[in-house]
């Protein structure tokens, strides 16, 4: 679906500006079902048949996050998981957030 999933997340050292609304609008169509909240973070909810499926998914996301060196906020429970992604060092969105979201969708 997206070339974003083929890229690698780049570590943010801070001091860079977050993406603008225009830049976000160009990247968002490359993602499937993600929403942008207040031009600050990406968010997506997932549904599963039971707790175990949600847990397995969350563990896979955690492994991916470690590989990429870019870590989302994850909340999950019986049959659901919610992922929020932003670059904490700049308290906003970077291309790496979109890359991670695209990679999560390929799991």
Model feature map: region roles:
Residues 1-32, 37-107:
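Long, contiguous binding/interaction regions
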């Amino acid at each position: 679906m997206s070339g974003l999933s083929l890229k690698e997340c780049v570590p943010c050292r801070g001091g860079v500006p977050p993406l603008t609304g225009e830049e976000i609008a160009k990247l968002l169509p490359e993602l499937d079902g993600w929403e942008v909240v207040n031009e600050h973070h990406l968010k997506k909810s997932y549904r599963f048949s039971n707790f175990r499926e949600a847990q397995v998914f969350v563990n896979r996301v955690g492994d991916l996050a470690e590989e990429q060196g870019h870590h989302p906020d994850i909340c999950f429970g019986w049959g659901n998981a919610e992922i929020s992604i932003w670059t904490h060092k700049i308290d906003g969105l970077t291309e790496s957030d979109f890359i991670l979201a695209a990679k999560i969708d390929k799991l």
